[in-house]
Structures are given as C-alpha cells and as structure tokens.
Amino acid sequence: MTRGNELHEAVKRSLERYFKDMDGEQPTAIYDMVLKNIEKPMIETVLGHAEGNQSRAAEMLGINRNTLRKKMQQLRIKG
C-alpha cells in the first residue's frame, strides 16, 4: 500500500467511525470539519520537517509562501 493510499484509508476509517458515532443523526458541514482537523497538523508536521523554513514548507505543500503564512495565522500556528 502506498503512503497516499494509507492516508486515504485512515481518513476513510475516521469518517466511518464519525458516522457510526452519530448514531443515525444527520451530520452537517463535514467538509469543513475534515479540513479543520487535517490542515493544522499537516502544516505543523511539514513545518517541522522543513525545520521551520516557511519557503521550504510551502514548496513541500505545493502552495505559495504567502498562502502558508495566511493559513498559519488563521490556524494560530507559530512560525
């Protein structure tokens, strides 16, 4: 299994658990919930691997450095 597939399966398992925990209730705003729960740890982890270098982290993420800085501010990630 490739790393992308592992991540895919982890997200899928988490969502299946989430639906099970909802016990038949209709969830809303799942897309935003997933992004909010994935985006911050993803950026923090990539920044760690980039040794705090925001330009390198942005390149690793495939986003513009200014976009990274904006997301860091929004998510209250210190840099």
Predicted segments, located by residue:
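Bacterial C-terminal helix-turn-helix
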Residues: 2-6, 13-79
